[in-house]
């Protein structure tokens, strides 16, 4: 937990950070400082609530300082190679593996072709389709790490008397997913066709560009937070059933079907359901059409 908090404090998306502590908890601010290490005192402020008379007023003063500091920033264009994008699905349906997840996979391939980085997680959702990822590992070391990634989660389940293949959920089944393998084949679609260039432990930061696999469970909040901890600037979240969930970084909701996109337009940012209607994949992931190129 302390390592995770420190990772979020250092996350590049945060222009300013106010770290709040009570004062007598186990993970108090002095303890947390050992995990934070070096930091910019203009960007990170600390407030221990028991030390001040009015913590809300004190917090507002510190937030004003942080806002003034962030106000000195200027937007600048960056190369696509600097981007780190997390990929996650939740509330999947029968179209997730046909529309939304392949769309994210095509985007992942496009970003990687420009030198960028993507991260795929939710390891239990890979069970049954893991060999597709193993066969794309760039070398033997990564292959062995991927095998361990899968087996470690399976061993965790069995050691705690949990059923490995309890997926899919009732919502998945109602949406048209019949088996875990069906769901897993959809999950792995988000990885596109690129080689696996990195396998990360939980909270481990990305250090290799390209496609990375991250050790984290299938739970939406935990997995998306894990993506942020590893450095993801944005999470692309596909769904067929719908969810209002968000994470510590901007979370782009991608629907697998047009019905959901129309019914929950306040939840959904992009409708991938058009892929089975009238929109080619090339346009779906942002490539210019013939008319646009002219």
Describe each PLM feature range.
Residues 1-234, 241-293:
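Metallocofactor- and cofactor-centric catalytic cores in central/energy metabolism, strongly enriched
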């Amino acid at each position: 937990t302390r390592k995770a908090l420190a990772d979020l404090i250092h996350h590049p998306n945060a222009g300013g950070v106010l770290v709040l502590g009570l004062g007598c908890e186990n993970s108090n601010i002095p303890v947390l400082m050992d995990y934070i290490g070096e930091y910019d005192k203009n960007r990170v402020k600390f407030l221990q609530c028991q030390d001040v008379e009015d913590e809300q007023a004190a917090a507002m003063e510190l937030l004003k300082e942080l806002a003034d500091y962030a106000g000195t920033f200027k937007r600048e264009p960056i190369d696509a190679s600097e981007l780190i994008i997390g990929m996650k699905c939740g509330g999947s349906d029968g179209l997730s593996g046909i529309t939304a997840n392949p769309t994210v996979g095509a985007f992942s391939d496009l970003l990687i072709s420009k030198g960028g980085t993507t991260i795929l997680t939710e390891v239990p959702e890979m069970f049954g389709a893991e060999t597709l990822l193993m066969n794309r590992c760039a070398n033997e070391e990564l292959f062995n790490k991927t095998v361990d990634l899968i087996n470690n989660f399976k061993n965790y389940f069995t050691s705690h008397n949990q059923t490995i293949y309890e997926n899919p959920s009732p919502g998945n089944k109602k949406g048209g997913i019949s088996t875990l393998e069906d769901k897993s084949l959809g999950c792995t679609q988000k990885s596109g066709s690129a080689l696996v260039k990195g396998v990360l432990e939980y909270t481990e930061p990305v250090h290799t560009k390209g496609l990375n696999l991250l050790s984290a469970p299938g739970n939406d909040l935990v997995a998306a937070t894990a993506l942020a901890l590893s450095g993801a600037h944005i999470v692309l979240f596909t769904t067929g059933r719908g969810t209002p969930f968000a994470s510590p970084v901007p979370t782009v909701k991608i629907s697998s079907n047009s019905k959901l996109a129309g019914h929950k337009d306040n939840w959904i940012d992009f409708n991938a359901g058009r892929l089975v209607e009238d929109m080619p994949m090339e346009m779906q992931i942002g490539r210019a059409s013939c008319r646009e190129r002219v």
